């Protein structure tokens, strides 16, 4: 398909501006407003907060059991990193380090809990989307389970839940190409963003690199993904969900718009360092 050019201009009249000098670094952050504070949660178990978006205070940073937001994951490391994300995982990290990336936090109005969706990742296409819950925005977030797997082959697919939703014939025909994962057509399970639509339904958009961006509905009562019925004509996969054309999301005039994660308009959200 072709591309469309838009004349997109923003007026800064009436908008307060200033320099951010607090030197808090949070990579791949999501932003949450709760209890009068703005929170950012990012890769490498980092988090910060601010009351005015200018002055930031570090809440957590670094891979450690003492991390007040993410540290509980080490208590269940055998489960949380079973597939990917550590040197002891089924698919080991390529640098033998722990990798927890790109969290997104949302308040679940049905359960009354804060949900953190994030990925553990080992290689450029072997990742696992997981989630945790907390009663407060600052955590600690208790690991609840794994949601979506990518990067497997015939030997490692047994370490995933893929065959709970599709049969072997479908999995081998679609998800595995030759001796490796079919990364050309299916996603790397990273970079989740969770949101409510105008009808109050909960969704997760995810994926990067590899085969594109996908969308799955979330069960509001559990926080788990809902695997849909296959619908090839509409690009709906029974495991990975609806294939989208582009990436991360924002709300514009009561519509959910999908924008490329690298787009200039959302670089400030997806790739900023404060």
Describe every region a protein language model picked out.
Residues 1-274:
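Carbohydrate-active catalytic/glycan-binding domains of CAZyme proteins
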């Amino acid at each position: 398909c072709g591309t469309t050019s838009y004349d997109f201009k923003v007026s800064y009249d009436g908008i307060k501006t200033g320099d951010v000098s607090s030197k808090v670094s949070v990579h791949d952050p999501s932003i949450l407003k709760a209890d009068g504070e703005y929170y950012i949660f990012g890769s490498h178990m980092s988090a910060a907060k601010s009351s005015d978006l200018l002055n930031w205070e570090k809440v957590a940073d670094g891979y450690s059991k003492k991390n007040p937001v993410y540290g509980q994951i080490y208590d269940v490391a055998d489960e949380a990193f079973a597939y990917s994300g550590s040197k002891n995982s089924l698919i080991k990290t390529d640098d033998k380090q722990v990798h927890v990336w790109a969290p997104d936090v949302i308040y679940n109005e049905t359960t009354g809990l804060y949900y953190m969706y994030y990925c553990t990742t080992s290689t450029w296409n072997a990742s696992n989307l997981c989630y945790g819950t907390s009663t407060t925005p600052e955590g600690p977030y208790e690991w609840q389970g794994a949601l979506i797997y990518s990067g497997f082959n015939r030997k490692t697919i047994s370490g995933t839940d893929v065959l709970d939703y599709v049969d072997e014939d479908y999995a081998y025909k679609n998800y595995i190409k030759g001796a490796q994962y079919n990364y050309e057509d299916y996603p790397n399970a990273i970079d989740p963003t969770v949101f409510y639509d105008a009808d109050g339904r909960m969704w997760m958009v995810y994926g990067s690199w590899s085969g594109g961006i996908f969308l799955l509905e979330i069960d509001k009562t559990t926080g788990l993904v809902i695997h849909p019925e296959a619908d090839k004509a509409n690009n709906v996969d029974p495991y990975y969900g609806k294939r989208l054309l582009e990436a991360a999301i924002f709300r514009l005039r009561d519509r959910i718009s999908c924008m490329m994660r690298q787009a200039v308009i959302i670089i400030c959200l997806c790739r900023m360092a404060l």
